[in-house]
Amino acid sequence: MKLTCVMIVAVLFLTAWTFVTADDSRNGLENLSPKARHEMKNPEASKSNKRYECYSTGTFCGVNGGLCCSNLCLFFVCLFS
């Protein structure tokens, strides 16, 4: 009986802890607005503006087609640059 009560209290505590420490998804877009505004003023601050070199046709691309200039990787080789 005591073990059952301890288990119930532990589950309730862990459930409450999960809700308390979880991110508030309702305000997620509000928190991104100041950052986006800052990135518009300073384009260098945006990580998405960084350009990475892409692989040309015939280059080994692994399984990630996003590394190819054409974004098309078939049998681990970039196609159509």
From Swiss-Prot:
- Disulphide connectivity of cysteines: 54-69, 61-73, 68-78
Report the GO molecular function annotations: sodium channel inhibitor activity; toxin activity
Keyword terms, alphabetized: Cleavage on pair of basic residues, Disulfide bond, Ion channel impairing toxin, Knottin, Neurotoxin, Presynaptic neurotoxin, Secreted, Signal, Toxin, Voltage-gated sodium channel impairing toxin
UniProt cross-references to InterPro entries, sorted A to Z: Conotoxin, Conotoxin_d-typ_CS, Conotoxin_omega-typ_CS
- Annotated compartments: Secreted
Q: Name one Pfam family in it.
A: Conotoxin
Instruction: Tell me where the signal peptide lies.
Output: 1-22
One GO cellular component term of this record is: host cell presynaptic membrane
Q: Which residues are annotated as pro-peptide in the record?
A: 23-51
Expression by tissue, per the entry, reads: Expressed by the venom duct.
Protein purpose: Delta-conotoxins bind to site 6 of voltage-gated sodium channels (Nav) and inhibit the inactivation process.
Domain comment as written in the entry: The presence of a 'disulfide through disulfide knot' structurally defines this protein as a knottin.
Entry similarity comment: Belongs to the conotoxin O1 superfamily.
Q: What is this protein called?
A: Delta-conotoxin-like Ac6.3
